[in-house]
Amino acid sequence: MLNSANTTAPSLLSAYGLNSYTSSNSGSVTKAAESTETAVADSASNKHEANQIRSGDFSIDSAIKKAADKYGVDEKLIRAVIKQESGFNAKAVSGAGAMGLMQLMPSTASSLGVSNPLDPQQNVEGGTKYLKQMLDKYDGNVSMALAAYNAGPGNVDRYGGIPPFQETQNYVKKITSVYYA
């Protein structure tokens, strides 16, 4: 990834296959290059963020699209949850026993009809179904749904909002910052 703080406009332009021009009689080309540098850096940053929430695995991407379509949940939200939960590691198992891409607890997985939480298709299907249930329960409030996904709906209800658990508060902030970017 290009580091715009240490990169000149001409080198940024060159990196994206664009031409760089200089002019001794006018600052307008320099200003245009600086504008382009900012635009290219912003574009690079946005592309970098988008790439961070791609699995790079066609079968996982396909499972995400299928679940998003089936449950009416934004694909970008599902990807942001997976990125936070497992870093797109289908074999991830937490210390608490949560498993797979969307880190389903065994009892939750079972209640969602997921027989193998380490199977990417089943995990994404079950995790998205659960995320949709939380979105419905909290009237589409993404932050509340994410808090419930992480800490359980009982805790969200008990505290009347995002629980005062540092882990849950950080979880919601991290996912929403990627999702709303």
Curated annotation (Swiss-Prot):
The keyword Lyase is annotated on this UniProt entry: yes
Keyword Hydrolase annotated: yes
Subcellular location: Secreted
Residues annotated as catalytic: E85
Substitution effect: E85Q: Lacks both muramidase and transglycosylase activities
Domain notes for this protein: The N-terminal domain is important for secretion and protein stability.
Protein name: Bifunctional muramidase/lytic transglycosylase CwlQ
Organism: Bacillus subtilis (strain 168)
Lineage: Bacteria, Bacillati, Bacillota, Bacilli, Bacillales
